[in-house]
């Protein structure tokens, strides 16, 4: 990958000038000028996904200039570097190959002169065999009973991805009850343990190093809870499996290393649901559905790696995001899925985007003088409409939004889905076109009211509109289409990081807090007053000690 400061390119300068021409142009004006706007600014993927980006403050000239930026920063070269196994995560000297985990074509992918696909396929086969034994009931716990509950213990990428996917694919789930524990707050695991029986529960401990503080604290608490009933430590092997590479620590914990599922240092945590970390997904929906998830992602990988940038969906969405973040000063993006099963999708890509591109140092080691990653947030519709949409519609901040919905619901109950989708369509229309003062006044006249007598209310009912949105309409949320959708967002994040000249696949920002926590933890072991920190931290620790006494 080349290290090119995007602001030093001629394309960036052209975009800055173009922004001056576009900043006062409205979405309504763009639609009024072009009756074919939807056709020009939308695209389908495999007849399973329609991406409509027409309700954005862009023209064909805007996209052409953004494409020039992608060319000048050598996006095509960056894509090739990732897919070929180059060590593009230079700060950790690692390749970035989550695409290999779902490489259903099985073509060789080389890292350090070695094809990784045989090992990828071997772990998949091992997960298949293990999961089928659990799901079928062939695997028995220490009292001879089949497993009924699975508890995934992990944090970050070892939790967010599997939890999001198992929830999104709940219509496909089998009889096993799935639980997820991540927070080191003892309340989290305590509440889960209240719901399960030690005789019929399988724990998955997801930690590559088997040293992650939160995960191992929860794992040891689960083990202690289990042994209070089971007694003999040999029974741990029937109720615990590991998603890890540290065979020594796994064995010392009491887990049979035959039930240790490995992954590799070229798998980043927030891109790991496709790996052994996805074992909880397999146990929830079955191996065949997991393969469909991989296949959908692989189809999007092929689209991303082979489609010209002008028609490349992840690239288009990434460029539009850069346009708002760096030229319009938008600081956030909202992800708004109109599907209750997708209720963790925004949280998943909050990590996916903010941990990837929340960087202030470029690939040359210099502080940037432009915007990198946006703040990502969101909730399912229609809940969000009754919470934060007020600010999106009438607030002072620009919040570009992605609206996501399936055309076909898994629960065709009465007219629920039509009502849900009517809101989905209405919101993007309202955000784009708003409601003028003239329309508000005419509505009053139609109601037999005199607008002049309601002058004090009229300004508050005006919607400026011109709020940008993308609409992603899926035919149906299936394992395949979900895989494609997740990969779409992954590649959008990669594209933005490549163009913005930052390292997307490290996360040094999480380290300092952990280091300080390790220093503070021993200081909390007694009741002595602390004076080794700043006055604020000292004051907080000392009040904590006083109150817990």
From Swiss-Prot:
GO biological process, one term: glucose 6-phosphate metabolic process
Gene3D superfamilies linked to this entry: 1.10.1390.10, Glucose-6-phosphate isomerase like protein, domain 1
Reaction catalysed by this enzyme: alpha-D-glucose 6-phosphate = beta-D-fructose 6-phosphate
Record-linked Pfam families: PGI
Pathway: Carbohydrate biosynthesis; gluconeogenesis; Carbohydrate degradation; glycolysis; D-glyceraldehyde 3-phosphate and glycerone phosphate from D-glucose: step 2/4
E.C. numbers: 5.3.1.9
InterPro entries: G6P_Isomerase (IPR001672), G6P_Isomerase_C (IPR023096), Phosphoglucose_isomerase_CS (IPR018189), SIS_dom_sf (IPR046348), SIS_PGI_1 (IPR035476), SIS_PGI_2 (IPR035482)
Keyword check for Protein biosynthesis: no
PROSITE patterns documented for this protein: P_GLUCOSE_ISOMERASE_1, P_GLUCOSE_ISOMERASE_2, P_GLUCOSE_ISOMERASE_3
Disulfide bonds: none
SUPFAM superfamilies per the UniProt record, alphabetical: SIS domain
Cell compartment(s), UniProt: Cytoplasm
Signal peptide: none
Keywords carried by this UniProt record: Cytoplasm, Gluconeogenesis, Glycolysis, Isomerase
Role according to the record: Catalyzes the reversible isomerization of glucose-6-phosphate to fructose-6-phosphate.
Name under which the protein is recorded: Glucose-6-phosphate isomerase
Organism field: Salmonella arizonae (strain ATCC BAA-731 / CDC346-86 / RSK2980)
């Amino acid at each position: 990958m080349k290290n090119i400061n995007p602001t030093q390119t001629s394309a960036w300068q052209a975009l800055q000038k173009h922004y001056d021409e576009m900043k006062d142009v409205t979405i309504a004006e763009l639609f009024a000028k072009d009756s074919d706007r939807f056709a020009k600014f939308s695209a389908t993927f495999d007849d399973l996904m329609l991406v409509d980006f027409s309700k954005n403050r862009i023209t064909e000239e805007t996209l052409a200039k953004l494409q020039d930026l992608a060319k000048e920063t050598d996006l095509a070269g960056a894509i090739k570097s990732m897919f070929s196994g180059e060590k593009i995560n230079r700060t950790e000297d690692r390749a970035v190959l989550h695409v290999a985990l779902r490489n259903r074509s099985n073509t060789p992918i080389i890292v350090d002169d070695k094809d990784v696909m045989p090992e990828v396929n071997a772990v998949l086969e091992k997960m298949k065999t293990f999961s089928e034994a659990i799901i079928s009931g062939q695997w028995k716990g220490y009292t001879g009973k089949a497993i009924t509950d699975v508890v995934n213990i992990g944090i970050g990428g070892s939790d967010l991805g599997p939890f999001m996917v198992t929830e999104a694919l709940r219509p496909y789930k089998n009889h096993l009850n799935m639980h997820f524990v991540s927070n080191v707050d003892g309340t989290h695991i305590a509440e889960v343990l209240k719901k399960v029986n030690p005789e019929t529960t399988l724990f998955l401990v997801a930690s590559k190093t088997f040293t992650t503080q939160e995960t191992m604290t929860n794992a040891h608490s689960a083990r202690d809870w289990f042994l209070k009933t089971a007694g003999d430590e040999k029974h741990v092997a029937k109720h615990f499996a590991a998603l890890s590479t540290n065979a020594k620590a796994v064995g010392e914990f009491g887990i049979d290393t035959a039930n240790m599922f490995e992954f590799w240092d070229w798998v980043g945590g927030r891109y790991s649901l496709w790996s052994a970390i996805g074992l909880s997904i397999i146990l929830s929906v079955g191996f065949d559905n997991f393969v469909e998830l991989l296949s959908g992602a692989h189809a999007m990988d092929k689209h991303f790696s082979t489609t010209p940038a002008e028609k490349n969906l992840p690239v288009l969405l990434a460029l539009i995001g850069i346009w708002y973040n760096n030229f319009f000063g938008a600081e956030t993006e909202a992800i708004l899925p109109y599907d209750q099963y997708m209720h963790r999708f925004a949280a998943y890509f909050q990590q996916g985007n903010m941990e990837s591109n929340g960087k202030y140092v470029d690939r040359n080691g210099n502080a940037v003088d432009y915007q990198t990653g946006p703040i990502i947030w969101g909730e399912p519709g229609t809940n969000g409409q009754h919470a934060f949409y007020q600010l999106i519609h009438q607030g002072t901040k620009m919040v570009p939004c992605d609206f996501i919905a399936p055309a076909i619901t898994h629960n065709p109950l009465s007219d629920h889905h039509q009502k849900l989708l009517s809101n989905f369509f209405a919101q993007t229309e309202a955000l784009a076109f708003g409601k003028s003062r003239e329309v508000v006044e005419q509505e009053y006249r139609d109601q037999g009211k005199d607008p002049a007598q309601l002058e004090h209310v009229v300004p508050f009912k005006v919607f400026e509109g011109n709020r940008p949105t993308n609409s992603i309409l899926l035919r149906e949320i299936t394992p395949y289409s979900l895989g494609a959708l997740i990969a779409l967002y992954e590649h959008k994040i990669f594209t933005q990081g490549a163009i913005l000249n930052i390292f997307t696949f490290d996360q040094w920002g999480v380290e300092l807090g952990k280091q300080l926590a390790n220093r503070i933890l021993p200081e909390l072991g007694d009741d002595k007053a602390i004076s080794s920190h700043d006055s604020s931290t000292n004051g907080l620790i000392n009040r904590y000690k006083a109150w817990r006494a």
